[in-house]
């Protein structure tokens, strides 16, 4: 099973013979394709096909077949039914030597096949066991969901998928309607093929302009033997969420200031809150104070403001941390009494963790997942709560679920930071530094990452990298001291905190 979410195709141009060979390999991945077999399918000589594969794909046909097998195995482990066995997946993909499969899988993806499978089972079980309830969308994006086109053999499946998708979108806070004239966006789809060759394709289009906003493709069986359709619909809704949210934000940006509603102001603030940097934070709080002045009971604006004021303390944006912490606490208590959707609840969970109130944070994150089990933000914040409670294994699972759900979300980098922090807590300092360096590469303005990345380098024995890291930290925060780091540090276990502060002292950060 293969699922993709994208806005524009980046697929390379291929010759007809290479495409034919690829189609043949994908249609029968378990077959031991020889070069002669592929040449017969492609209609060219083996030497020509070999040369074209190297020219277009940079690899031999055998290497490409192995890539296809591993990608298929990974997707089946990520999206298959709960009772799927790892060994059966490997054999079905033509990877018959299980020991070699496990070693190569870990080299490619940084985790074992069993870890991928465990995460999938955790997610499906969470969806099945959480009592779902709806919170009516307030001033949210309106989407019309058209019928999913399918042949007679897939007609019933198409109707079930459309029904589950409508429910998943509504749980995610999207207003789903049947009249196109009332909608900002139109979501349509098709189902083609059968069995393992089934393909579900969805397209999200802006109604006013006809512009394609996003697309989603799922390859794999959709019958009763596959994962529950509720699970697939939840994943689709989660993958579309960043694009839908961006469409809302762009709509708010296009409005004249005189026409802005509290929701519009909250949406304008959101990308600045998500930036997790000082400039963005200052712009966000301005928008959010305006929103709350117009509607003191606006749940999203209040939750975002609580988080934004908490960021000022934790990320050292503030000259008055005590005042900002008090303002964050006041707003968080107020937001907890308002009826927010899954997005507002996940944001509120962020605010409570920065206030070191892990019980309240855990409660609202559970509520967020009860509303929308596919909320990547809620899964990620659940991972942070596990980090703060010292449960590295559970934290990494939750962060990776968040990344599986919405790999292109603006907050995805913060899940990478979280994985790094979880590895640090487990004593895997080299891995901790590697994940946090990856996060910093994706979001260079978040220089506060050096606060925990530098100690990871110190404890991993990487002295040159540690010196470069602390230099970058002090360039951004020239007056920063260990006392200020202690004041703004998240609620990590005491042993974790001591390691960080001692390492920062060792590389020269003043007390």
Where are the language model's segments positioned?
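Short, basic-rich loop-to-helix N-cap that marks the start of a DNA-contacting helix
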Residues: 63
């Amino acid at each position: 099973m293969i699922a993709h979410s994208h806005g524009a195709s980046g697929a390379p141009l291929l010759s007809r013979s290479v495409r034919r060979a690829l189609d043949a390999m994908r249609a029968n991945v378990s077959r031991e394709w020889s070069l002669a077999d592929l040449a017969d399918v492609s209609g060219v000589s083996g030497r020509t096909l070999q040369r074209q594969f190297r020219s277009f794909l940079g690899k031999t046909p055998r290497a490409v077949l192995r890539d296809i097998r591993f990608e298929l195995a990974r997707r089946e482990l990520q999206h298959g039914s709960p009772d799927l066995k790892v060994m059966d997946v490997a054999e079905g993909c033509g990877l018959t030597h299980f020991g070699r499969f496990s070693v190569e899988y870990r080299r490619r993806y940084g985790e074992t096949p069993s870890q991928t499978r465990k995460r999938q089972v955790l997610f499906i079980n969470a969806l099945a066991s959480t009592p779902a309830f709806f919170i009516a969308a307030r001033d949210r994006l309106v989407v019309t969901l058209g019928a999913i086109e399918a042949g007679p053999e897939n007609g019933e499946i198409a109707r079930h998928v459309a029904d589950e998708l409508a429910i998943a979108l509504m749980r995610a806070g999207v207003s789903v309607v049947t009249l196109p004239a009332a909608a900002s966006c139109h979501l349509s789809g098709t189902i083609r093929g059968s069995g393992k060759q089934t393909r579900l394709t969805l397209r999200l289009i802006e109604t006013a302009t006809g512009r394609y906003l996003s697309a989603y493709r799922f390859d794999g069986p959709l019958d009763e033997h596959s994962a529950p359709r509720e699970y697939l619909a939840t994943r689709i809704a989660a993958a579309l969420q960043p694009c839908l949210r961006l469409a809302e934000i762009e709509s708010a940006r296009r409005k004249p200031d005189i026409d802005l509603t509290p929701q519009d102001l909250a949406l304008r603030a959101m990308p600045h809150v998500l930036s997790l940097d000082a400039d963005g934070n200052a712009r966000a709080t301005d928008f959010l104070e305006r929103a709350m002045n117009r509607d003191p009971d606006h749940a999203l604006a209040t939750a975002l403001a609580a988080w934004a004021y908490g960021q000022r303390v934790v990320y050292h944006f503030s000259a008055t941390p005590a005042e900002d912490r008090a303002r964050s606490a006041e707003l968080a208590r107020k937001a907890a009494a308002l009826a927010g959707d899954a997005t507002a609840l996940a944001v509120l969970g962020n605010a409570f963790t920065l206030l070191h109130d892990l019980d309240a944070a855990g409660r609202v994150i559970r509520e967020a997942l009860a509303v929308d089990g596919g909320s990547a933000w809620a899964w990620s914040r659940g991972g942070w709560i596990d980090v703060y409670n010292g449960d590295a294994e559970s934290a990494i699972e939750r962060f990776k679920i968040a990344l599986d759900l919405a790999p292109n979300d603006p907050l995805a980098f913060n899940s990478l930071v979280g994985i790094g922090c979880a590895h640090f807590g487990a004593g895997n300092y080299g891995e901790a530094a590697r994940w946090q360096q990856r996060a910093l590469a994706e979001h260079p303005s978040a220089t506060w990452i050096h606060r925990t990345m530098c100690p990871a380098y110190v404890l991993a024995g990487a002295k040159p990298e540690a010196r470069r890291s602390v230099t970058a930290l002090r360039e951004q925060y020239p007056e920063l001291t260990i006392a200020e780091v202690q004041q703004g540090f998240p609620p990590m276990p005491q042993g974790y905190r001591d390691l960080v502060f001692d390492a920062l002292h060792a590389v020269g950060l003043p007390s």
